[in-house]
Amino acid sequence: MLKACFLFGGKSFEHEVSVSSIRSVFLAYISKKFDITIGGLDLENRLQFFSHEEFLERFQEYSRFEKADRPANYEDLKKFDVVFPLMHGDYVEDGSLQGLFSLFGIPFVGPSVLSSSVCMDKEVAKRLLIQAGLKVADWISLGPFEMLEIEVVTEKIGYPCFVKPASSGSSCGVSKVHSAIELEKAVLEARRFSKKVLIEKAITGMELECAVLGLEDLLASRVGQIIPQKEFYDYESKYVLREAAVIEAPANIPDSLEKEIRQVALKVFRVLDCEMMGRVDFFYDGELYVSEVNTIPGFTPISLYPKLLELTGIGYNELIDQLLEMAIRSHHHRERQAPLAPNSLCLP
């Protein structure tokens, strides 16, 4: 039996979402192929391993792993055949953790260091998508030392608009702004989560999502829709007030629109060099806009990624097995293409 380690937690604003994801997987996933160990990163990114019983007893849904009392060495992860980081946000979804796995030669589920970094920075991803001929909402970015110019926002973006961290997920730090008076407060809130801030034109329309799975051959799932019962689908709506949004899976949309979304989702995946898994989010107001790509989508009880793939014919156990197997296959492929050893010469 192959050995797999499922990781959760980390020094991230989305720490609690990760705990919920790992609980959901642990309670639902039954494998005949993999022997599963659970590893947690505390709020200072210290690693600790847990028995199944200890994990379930210690961590409830959306709880926190404050401090490791039996810290382990990251090199201990090398004893596993594959690692599945069900983790979200800074340090764990932005390429940092992926770089560590790559450095130690550990197979892992998810995209490369570069793809993780690109998708985490919403502005960089937008620029690449535009270059590929895809539509995104208009935006202005504010770097860490740039001042907010309200007149420029009013003229170029208008209201309502969204102010959001450039590199955060789960709607952390996102505000919907209706007038210039609200801008400064929203920018300050977004800067709590990211040095760079985006001010983005609000698209009034449908919020749609498509799950993508695969390596060489990609599969785009059926399309789901988020129907917020509040003004927008913020962190509280997603994880605290679950009745604050209606989730339709599959979405009640024309077949032609679903086909277009699935095709565009595959194109987005390839443009941003993603692999294995990802959820592509869209807005639709008569035209289709790419919102963002989530390279480690949630696996919480309300998460659409596994639900949409199940609608497409891939059950929960099969999905997890496929992801773990893809990670091992992708790692072996990268190893075959590894650069020359330091003492090798590349002569003409």
How would you describe each model-predicted region?
Residues 1-7, 241-250, 304:
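A short small-residue
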Residues 1-109, 113-114, 118-120, 124, ...:
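ATP-binding N-terminal substructure of ATP-dependent carboxylate-amine bond-forming enzymes
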Residues 53-57, 127-128, 155-157, 180, ...:
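Short, hinge-like loop/turn segments at secondary-structure boundaries
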Residues 99-108, 179, 184, 312:
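A glycine- and small-aliphatic-rich helix-loop capping segment at beta-alpha/alpha-beta transitions
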